[in-house]
Amino acid sequence: MYGIENQTKVEKRMPARISGYEGASYRGQYDKKTIVPVITMVLYYGTDRKWTAPKNLKSLIKVPDNLDKYVNDTKANVFEIAWLTDEQIAKFTSDYKIVANFFVNKRKNKDYIPDDKTTIKHVDEILKFLSVMTGDSRYEEILSDKEGVSNMCDVAQRLEDRGIEKGLQKGREEGNQMIYSLVEDE
């Protein structure tokens, strides 16, 4: 059984959280004939710094030396997505390759404009995911008119088109405001 924890910020008590999740999963299997292992992975999408928090439970608590061997030490399996190498990204064969590439490039350049020409198989899911993980609602806004979106270049074009349209609208509003104020002054 796998658990996936998506993080955009470093969580200093992640091993304790994982211990709770895994404990609940094992408890849920208590009455089953066979208990299967529970593996929790933390997918960290932070682009400003690497994961700096403890990755095991014993790093969070003070355990007297004489009790150390009796205390379980839950480990946080943290994967720093924005820090993957090109070789690691190349191993992905699903849409996740597009996601990983996006965050690596966002880390390298905060003003990164998506330029990945890889075809997106699950457009809804990718755009919703990017919206949530980046806090940028424009990705989800593209969903209302996703026709013709097949790769990240299309997404970038839609973002640019929306930005241009908003700029034109704002320019029209400011122009109208200026005309009204000139007319009122006469």
Model segments located where?
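A general recognition-element feature
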Residues: 1-166
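Assembly-interface segments of oligomeric complexes
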Residues: 169-186
